[in-house]
Design a protein with these regions (language model features):
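Residues forming the flavin
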Residues: 2-409
């Protein structure tokens, strides 16, 4: 069995993992980053959106940011292995990997920065070629520079679909709308306009449409039902793309390729009305958001908690991003669904936490304090919030950690 030894093994080459690896390497630790994708960088590689105040022109270009991060990591001496899938994690700590020049990494400490996975809602006909996840469409356009279709509809109303709809439009794809999924056993609140509006009102300040911002100021979570009833059946436009809260895609049409969809008008609570129409198109993008990819944390023996406000099941962690499993740290979307800026800031906190745990950093070091302050600042000012009750989720997580503090070093 081929073996590689190091001070720190980082699982996941996104912004959280890379930032942590860079700081740990600069602090004198030997670091190996394992990433399953052909190119490291995580979801940064597919991100392109406006971000007021960022850079010279107010655009967030994830690929450029990823290149800069990776260059810093390599200059710090971080070894980055792409195309390497981690399939197991044994105590003390042996990382089992496939696709690398070695089969096992023996590390004193492990950072799990595996990110998140996209959820989909089943729609009749969703296995027809031309029906893909919204995240896949984003990769086609922003990573490979390929338009996955000419005329598209988004299924699912959430931050992810709204963001990617605009990215598709910027790439020259005609996006006919962002519609609801059909009501069913797997769609739950995602198919209920009232519940969707309740979530959107919590994020109305970020809305690109003045009408949506006004709606957020008028309606609250308690009056979301009224907002859903009054929502125009023809939709409200976001960047010239109709947001169709009172229309659901109930079927994807086609044989060897998507040729269109069936759209049905729905009530304020998602019930079908029987009023249907067909729309010709060649691309359907489905998404019900993201959930934390936390299986390796479970395998490591980390204590977990179900926190819907953070997107699902997440590991409990402390102020240094340490978990209850000795020597195991976490950062990024495995801790809850947030934006890339927050993940990058968490990576810095984890990096300094790892150095502190290794005895390479004095207690309350100014750099560590600055990293925590940066995380709080970035989180408070984040332009993208995937879950409206994020603060409640973070509070729950902090309360759950308190009695466990000290279990991990």
């Amino acid at each position: 069995m081929s073996l590689r030894t190091c001070d720190l093994a980082v699982i996941g080459g996104g912004p959280a993992g890379i930032n942590a690896a860079t700081i740990a390497a600069r602090g004198g630790l030997s670091v190996v980053v394992l990433d399953e994708h052909p190119r490291p960088g995580g979801r940064l590689l597919g991100q392109l959106h406006e971000l007021p105040g960022h850079g010279e022109d107010g655009w967030w270009r994830g690929a450029e940011i990823a290149r800069a991060m990776l260059a810093e990591a390599r200059s710090a001496g971080v070894e980055i292995i792409s195309g390497a899938s981690v399939w197991g994690l044994r105590p003390e700590w042996e990382v089992l990997v496939e696709g690398a020049p070695f089969e096992t990494v023996k590390a004193n400490r492990v950072l799990i920065a595996t990110g998140a996975v996209e959820k989909s809602v089943p729609v009749p006909g969703w296995t027809i070629p031309g029906c893909i996840t919204a995240g896949a469409a984003q990769v086609f356009v922003n990573v490979h520079r390929v338009r996955p279709g000419r005329k598209a509809i988004m299924v699912g109303v959430n931050v992810l679909t709204m963001t990617i709809a605009r990215e598709l439009a910027l790439a020259g794809v005609e996006v006919v709308g962002i519609a609801m999924p059909p009501l069913g056993p797997f769609s739950a609140e995602a198919a209920n306009p009232t519940r969707v509006i309740a979530g959107l009102t919590q994020m109305a300040g970020l809305a690109p449409s003045p009408l949506l911002r006004l709606a957020g100021a008028i309606f609250s979570e308690r009056t979301a039902g009224l907002g859903a009833q009054l929502f125009p059946k023809g939709g409200v436009k976001l960047w010239s793309i109709p947001l169709l809260l009172r229309q659901a895609v109930v079927e994807v049409l086609g044989d060897e390729q998507v040729t269109g969809v069936v759209i049905e008008e729905i009530t304020a609570d998602g019930q079908p009305t029987g009023h249907r129409r067909q729309v010709e198109l060649d691309l359907v993008c489905i998404s019900d958001g993201l959930y934390p990819l936390s299986e390796l944390a479970v395998a490591a023996g980390c204590r977990m908690a179900d926190v819907p406000e953070l997107g699902g099941r997440v590991p409990l962690y402390g102020p240094n991003m340490e978990t209850t499993a000795k020597g195991v740290f976490v950062a990024g979307n495995i801790t809850g669904i947030e934006g890339a800026q927050v993940a990058a800031a968490q990576g810095k906190v984890a990096g300094y936490g790892i150095l502190a745990g290794a005895g390479r950093l004095a207690p309350n070091d100014p750099a560590q304090t600055a990293a925590r302050e940066e995380l709080a600042r970035v989180r408070a000012g984040s332009p993208i919030r995937f879950h409206p009750r994020l603060s409640d989720g973070l509070q729950k997580l902090g309360q759950a950690w308190q009695p466990l503090a000290g279990e991990s070093t």
